[in-house]
Regions:
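Conserved functional acidic sites
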Residues: 1-164
C-alpha cells in the first residue's frame, strides 16, 4: 500500500481558500498546471474585498525526499511523525498523520498535521493540515506580527485544463 499523497501535484487542480487576517479577509485561488521537466506550475492569486488582486507563480516538484517549491522543501517524503524541516524563520515538524479537519469545503480525516515555530517560538507558532489527495485544507498561525487563518472553501478543476 502506498503512502497517502498529502500534497498532490496535479495539473488542473484548483483550490480556493478564505484567508482571514486582522485587517481583512481575502480569497486565495491556487491553480496547478504542467511545468517544465515534470514539475508543476502553481499559481496563487489573492483577491481583496475591493477586487484588487496579486498573483505569484512557483515551480513545485516531487523528489525522493520531499516536495519542493522553488527549490525549498515544503513537505518531507515519506511523511512520518517527527520528520522535521525548516523554511527560516519557520521550523516545521510532522506531528500526526491521523488529524481531522472541518472546512467549508468538507470534512477531512487522515490528515497530516504539521506544526511550526516562528523564530524558535519567539515570534509565534502555527499548524497546517494536509488532507490525502487534496493538499492544504487548513492553517492557523499565531504569528505575533500578523496572525492568520487559511480555510479551504472549494476544490475542483481549473478552467481550460482537461481532466487527467
Amino acid at each position: 500500500m502506498s503512502d497517502p499523497d498529502y500534497l498532490p501535484l496535479t495539473p488542473g487542480l484548483r483550490l480556493e481558500y478564505r484567508v482571514r487576517r486582522a485587517q481583512e479577509t481575502r480569497t486565495l485561488v491556487v491553480e496547478q498546471s504542467s511545468g517544465p521537466d515534470g514539475s508543476v506550475a502553481v499559481r496563487r492569486t489573492w483577491t481583496a474585498p475591493d477586487g484588487a488582486s496579486e498573483t505569484e507563480t512557483a515551480r513545485v516538484e516531487r523528489r525522493a525526499d520531499g516536495v519542493y517549491e522553488n527549490g525549498e522543501k515544503v513537505l518531507p517524503l515519506p511523511a512520518r511523525p517527527g520528520a522535521a524541516w525548516s523554511l527560516p524563520p519557520r521550523a516545521y515538524r510532522v506531528a500526526a498523520l491521523d488529524a481531522a479537519a472541518r472546512t467549508p469545503a468538507g470534512d477531512f480525516a487522515g490528515c497530516l498535521r504539521a506544526t511550526y515555530l516562528i523564530a524558535g517560538g519567539d515570534a509565534g507558532a502555527g499548524e497546517r493540515l494536509y488532507a490525502p489527495g487534496v493538499g492544504l485544507v487548513r492553517e492557523v498561525c499565531s504569528d505575533e506580527a500578523d496572525p492568520f487563518e487559511v480555510l479551504l472553501t472549494a476544490r475542483g478543476r481549473a478552467a481550460g485544463e482537461a481532466a487527467r
